[in-house]
């Protein structure tokens, strides 16, 4: 396979990424249709752009400027009193940056000490159950053996109901478990070990999108990392077989793509609805 670089990382489809894997977890049929170009996702780009706006700032001045050059039209207001400045949806991004940039604990963790070897946006790769997998890490401290993932989230401590844990939990718990970040970090830890032969400690720097952003350094316990990676291992071969055309993609029957393909050929009873897993 072609060597992975910053230039070809997003174009090379010979490797599976965590985000692409999660699309297939949600609905194989939709993910396959997206890959083939049969289906085009209509979604709000704001959360992704906001996250990348914050990420690029802490990567480097050059990375942030490049991001603004490529996406400025989407982030900057063209009319009104904010013309030339950030749109209201992205003003919180500056608040999130301000909350972190002068925080000594964050800077020590994310950027390391002057003598540390720290790499930003490090490409990692390897094989999971024989499937080629790649990823990009926000910040890796090669000197001290840890890596950091910067996550923007609605809130860290506001209480929410967790369907998985069946109790109220801080919002960060739902964010991590629902988006599978424990699996993502477990995966990246495994890929780093394959590349370096060393065990790295993963951390999340969480920053909230609240009017006054909250922030926290989170450590995912080993049992959660292992559980998340085990789930990926249990499903990744089937996903790769679907991608390669060796297996027909399954429909979830409930996403927008599946609804677009739906034909009314059966009657659903009230008890069917009550007993369904959906």
Question: Where in this protein do the model-derived segments appear?
Answer:
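Hydrophobic/aromatic-lined pockets within catalytic cores
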Residues: 58-62, 152-155, 193-197, 244
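Metal-dependent nuclease catalytic regions and adjoining charged, substrate-binding loops involved
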Residues: 97, 175-182, 187-278
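Secondary-structure boundary elements
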Residues: 111-112, 141-149, 192-200
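Short, flexible loop/turn elements at secondary-structure junctions
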Residues: 122-128, 141-143, 152-154, 259
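Coil-to-beta-strand transition motifs
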Residues: 130-134, 141, 145, 199, ...
């Amino acid at each position: 396979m072609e060597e992975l670089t910053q230039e070809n990382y997003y174009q090379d489809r010979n490797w599976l990424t965590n985000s692409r894997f999660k699309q297939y977890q949600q609905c194989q049929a939709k993910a396959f249709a997206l890959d083939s170009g049969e289906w085009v996702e209509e979604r709000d780009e704001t959360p992704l752009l906001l996250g990348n706006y914050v990420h690029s700032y802490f990567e480097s001045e050059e990375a942030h400027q490049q991001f603004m050059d490529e996406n400025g039209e989407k982030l900057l207001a063209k009319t009104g009193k904010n013309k030339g400045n950030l749109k209201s949806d992205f003003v919180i991004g500056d608040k999130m940056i301000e909350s972190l940039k002068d925080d000594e604990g964050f800077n020590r963790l994310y950027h390391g000490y002057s003598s540390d070897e720290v790499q930003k946006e490090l490409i990692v790769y390897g094989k999971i159950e024989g499937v080629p997998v790649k990823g990009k890490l926000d910040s890796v401290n090669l000197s001290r053996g840890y890596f950091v993932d910067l996550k923007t989230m609605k809130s860290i401590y506001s209480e929410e109901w967790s369907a998985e844990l069946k109790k109220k939990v801080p919002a960060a718990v739902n964010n991590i478990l629902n988006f599978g970040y424990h699996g993502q970090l477990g995966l990246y830890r495994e890929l780093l070990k394959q590349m370096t032969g060393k065990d790295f400690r993963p951390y999340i720097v969480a920053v909230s999108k609240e009017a006054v952003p909250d922030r926290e350094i989170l450590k995912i316990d080993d049992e959660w990392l292992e559980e998340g990676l085990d789930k990926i291992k249990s499903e990744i071969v089937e996903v790769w077989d679907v991608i390669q055309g060796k297996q027909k993609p399954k429909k979830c029957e409930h996403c927008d793509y599946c609804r677009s393909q739906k034909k009314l050929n059966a009657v659903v009873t009230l008890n069917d609805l009550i007993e369904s897993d959906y």
